[in-house]
Amino acid sequence: TTKAVAELLHMAGVNFAVLGKRETCTGDPARRSGNEFLYQILSRENIETFNEVFAGRPKGKKKVVVTCPHCFTTIGRDYAQSGFELEMLHHTQLLNTLIKEKRLKPSPHKSEQKLTYHDPCYLGRHNQIYEPPRELLESAGVEVNEMPRNKERSFCCGAGGGRMWMEEKIGERINLNRVDEAIATGAEEVAVGCPFCRVMVSDGMVAKNSSVEVL
């Protein structure tokens, strides 16, 4: 996803840079799992890097684009607790804007395959970003077959709060519940806007022996 986004930004003539080897985890998994000490170390390291990268730039020129809603929330909100603020953009927001500005021109084609979209918790309910991903899909000629629980009523994939690395002791994993909803739409593809969700939904499809492709 990150490589594809970079290629699209280049095509649109966007002036951007990547942190490369200086990029490290935002600390989201550590904080959500209760390891505040590790989170503080990682957040301070990132804040120092951002301060160096954006040195001398006015506030309106400090923008960070991420492909992960967890990073979006952690950098945009959690880091603000340390007095650090940046303008955050999820890649679907930026790409959607570039299309509206005609800096990117998709070649829409009517797909015969049915597709459904999963709203990530940290993109949707936490940050109220619902339409940009859907508008992007529509601009590509894709019709979204919504699951019963969508947008502000969307159901978690099961990865939040550090649960991605934990095994269930009782009951069924949340991702299997969500995957059942996606399969029930008759969709052949599931689009997601979060790497955590992609892992959980993909694992769920494997567990269900489903041929539905996760994008």
Specify the residue positions occupied by each region the protein language model found.
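Iron-sulfur cluster-binding electron-transfer modules in prokaryotic oxidoreductases
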Residues: 1-215
